[in-house]
Amino acid sequence: MTTLHFSGFPRVGAFRELKFAQEKYWRKEISEQELLDVAKDLREKNWKHQAAANADYVAVGDFTFYDHILDLQVATGAIPARFGFDSQNLPLEQFFQLARGNKDQFAIEMTKWFDTNYHYLVPEFHADTEFKANAKHYVQQLQEAQTLGLKAKPTVVGPLTFLWVGKEKGSVEFDRLSLLPKLLPVYVEILTALVEAGAEWIQIDEPALAVDLPKEWVEAYKDVYATLNKVSAKILLGTYFGSVAEHAALLKSLPVDGLHIDLVRAPEQLDAFAGYDKVLSAGVIDGRNIWRANLNKVLETVGPLQAKLGERLWISSSCSLLHTPFDLSVEEKLKANKPDLYSWLAFTLQKTQELRVLKAALNEGRDSVAEELAASQAAADSRANSSEIHRADVAKRLADLPVNAGQRKSPFADRIKAQQAWLNLPLLPTTNIGSFPQTTEIRQARAAFKKGELSASDYEAAMKKEIALVVEEQEKLDLDVLVHGEAERNDMVEYFGELLSGFAFTQYGWVQSYGSRCVKPPIIFGDVSRPEAMTVAWSTYAQNLTKRPMKGMLTGPVTILQWSFVRNDIPRATVCKQIALALNDEVLDLEKAGIKVIQIDEPAIREGLPLKRADWDAYLNWAGESFRLSSAGCEDSTQIHTHMCYSEFNDILPAIAAMDADVITIETSRSDMELLAAFGEFKYPNDIGPGVYDIHSPRVPTEAEVEHLLRKAIEVVPVERLWVNPDCGLKTRGWKETLEQLQVMMNVTRKLRAELAK
């Protein structure tokens, strides 16, 4: 009989219950116990959904109050020593301070989890880091599931991936792999505690196997799993996000009891594991996208596998379902307005049922689920033949693009002269990244407008009032290049998707980005174009309120692609270029309307990189081409900005330079300007604005901290090409800390300008 198991589930709840409870707790509106009760209820619901899909093992240990890698830092005693906290007795309040910072310490750095848009908290490893086991997080969840009468499989990120996703810190140079001998015994203690609590199987996830690992890291797997094999539980080694075929010989030799492989991202790797003689878990339902599977097609893969493997075949999603929205069935508007599209989709709960159908088809025969298989086939056929998806005019515009269509008219050296001639900016020009606080009033007005309780004219008036406030406050602070604050935007991607053709939206399709921050990605289901101007009216209104330059604000094509659920019937590169041409129409309209500083945000450029370096060039070529297409045809005097965050840039700087933005602003404060060093070494040719304070925390930095970062930046970047700005947009902050933070930034800027003028 084929076994069905799960690797992980969304944590926030069907209606973001965890988010709202967390934020109430942070505002001291509910007690810790009330927050714990919400979390326990969500875990139980998740397990019951998995059980309802006839799962043989539900996933435990995947639920977290903030981030599963932060949980692992606590479990291994690897929390940053700079906080002075005891990982053995860590109150929830201190757990959140690790993630969000406090008055004495900045938050743990955050970056993307492999090539997803989920963020994890980066472990800080020092040469003298000591580890200490605390298995409470995993054991408690295991026991909770057992109390419900469920068979549960704890899921823990493995030791090599844990070290791989961390960073070396401190003044002593060392390789974090050298910490492995100290870390391994702690893992043994954690796994032993789980065995003692009744775990039969434990899933140890090693997604690092899907990247280009150095030889010494690959070789370390032998000793690691020889050691972990001494624990009496059965180990399922989990891999996902890409192919691990190159490590097939190693993986077949490891003393584990089973292997999970991602057959959605890398179906071709199955051949490499044809002779595997242990449990093989086939990840056949997409854990990262929202398209319904053609179950008959999936059975063409897993049917023959079952014939070969028998009871050694397990099935699951490709990876944790963390990356998918919770439940399609609550999307009543989508069902009413786009019934065909609705029939092509599957969210987390629907994916659990797809797995239930597959298990039944394998174990009881296809006739037992004939109706479900027929419905799956009908949806696949409908999507393949839909006239809603393909547009001849969009295809023709792409086909007719000349070579080098995105090239600016002149090189940067000439453009910057034309720009400074009218901008007349001081040394160390200051700006904001884009958004200002999304207040309760803004959200209430938007909600009332969407419900039809507020007229279009009243909504516009409310947003204009907010824009006027943002402009006024920036002028008071004496910022140089202003932003309008994006009051009218619910989300930097969703806003544009709602105004572009080929996109669709959900009401409750939220996925976790980090902590309590959730995003609701648009669905790109068809060819993309821009029916009418999207931002021009708001930007020109803001520009008319001030004599200072006002930035037009657009989200770039790669980021819109990366932060959407993308159609999987044509290449992603084609979709991206379609978006770029739609944005180009907007850029040229902004320019005509007198907006001569235009920011095209690309925070997601790096997360689109394939996990294997051999595939990078192809991606970077079409990503860079798409960015250039979006600003094609601009005058030299129009200044194009871009913004990138949470990124390691060192290895893609030539590609970033080839994007040829006049100004790039980057997130650097959490890494103490570490990321900026690469730009200096590369001699990045255009203007740079490194973030001088962290906006992800409500903490107001001291002037000394901001000055320290800005002086470090001046050491790296020629001062005439250096801008001063926060790390990122200010949407999630409150007004009080926003103004205090910006005031600190401006005070330091004025001090250094005066010093440099001497």
UniProtKB/Swiss-Prot annotation:
Binds 1 zinc ion per subunit. The keyword Methyltransferase applies. Its cofactor is Zn(2+). L-methionine binds at residues 433-435, 486, 601. InterPro entries: Cbl-indep_Met_Synth_N (IPR013215), Cobalamin-indep_Met_synthase (IPR006276), Met_Synth_C/arc (IPR002629), UROD/MetE-like_sf (IPR038071). Belongs to the vitamin-B12 independent methionine synthase family. This is 5-methyltetrahydropteroyltriglutamate--homocysteine methyltransferase. It comes from Neisseria gonorrhoeae (strain ATCC 700825 / FA 1090). The lineage of its organism: Bacteria, Pseudomonadati, Pseudomonadota, Betaproteobacteria, Neisseriales.
